A protein has these predicted regions:
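Bacterial N-terminal signal peptides
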Residues: 2-11
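Extended ligand-binding groove/face enriched in aromatic
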Residues: 142-173
Length: 220
């Protein structure tokens, strides 16, 4: 009986403990409770994409694509050298692929986490909420396009089995494992995200004051 009486107290203590956050940390609920927080989250995703060498700071910009086309050579001490030589089973080539895969889907996870908080919000809550939604959906489509570009076979491939199992197209944030989609389905989902993003981003002209005519003047 003493145990039963004490149980609610213990459970209450656990809930109180789980609700306590270090002063230096900001919870997701707090972060996405303001427009500035939403923007910080989006900036954070761009920062991760732009500074991570396993993404656009190196691997996905000039390194992996250019080396695969044979435009440049690379030191044998770099793991990418094994990719260039098509030594796919070598542990160094596997490391390159794993890093690309893990960091690419980690970035997609950040996007989905932000969308989880942003999509339910109405226009009345934040002035630019439609732009946040559109930008995040476009980012999700773009990141999946990059993953398909690197890891999936091309449309022209005759390998039906490989095309049937291209990459996972992840649209939720959580511990659930997303199954692989076919190449056709991946691009169907990319187009769907971009179409939805375009609808939201159409609010740009209404919400953002800017000179839009002759934007290319001065460029050759």
């Amino acid at each position: 009986s003493y145990i039963l009486l004490a149980l609610p107290l213990l459970l209450g203590s656990c809930e109180a403990y789980l609700d306590v956050n270090p002063k230096s940390e900001v919870t997701d609920k707090e972060l996405f409770s303001t427009a500035e927080g939403c923007e910080d989250a989006i900036y954070g995703i761009y920062t991760e994409m732009g500074t991570n060498k396993n993404l656009f700071a190196y691997a996905l910009t000039f390194a992996y694509p250019e080396l695969m086309t044979g435009n440049f050579t690379i030191s044998q001490s770099d793991n990418l050298a094994y990719v260039v030589q098509r030594l796919w089973e070598h542990e160094n080539a596997i490391t390159v692929a794993e890093n690309l895969w893990i960091n690419g889907y980690k970035a997609i996870g950040y996007v989905n986490k932000a969308l989880m908080h942003v999509l339910p919000k109405s226009d009345d809550e934040f002035r630019h909420i439609r732009l946040y939604k559109g930008e995040l959906l476009a980012l999700r489509a773009y990141l999946h396009f990059e993953m398909a570009r690197i890891f999936a076979v091309p449309f022209a491939s005759g390998d039906a089995a490989a095309k049937a199992k291209a990459i996972p197209y992840v649209t939720t944030y959580g511990i659930e494992v997303t199954p692989y989609s076919s190449l056709d389905k991946v691009f169907e989902l990319i187009v769907a995200d971009l179409t939805e993003a375009e609808k939201y981003l159409a609010a740009d002209e209404e919400l953002v004051t800017a000179t839009r005519d002759n934007a290319s003047d001065g460029f050759t």
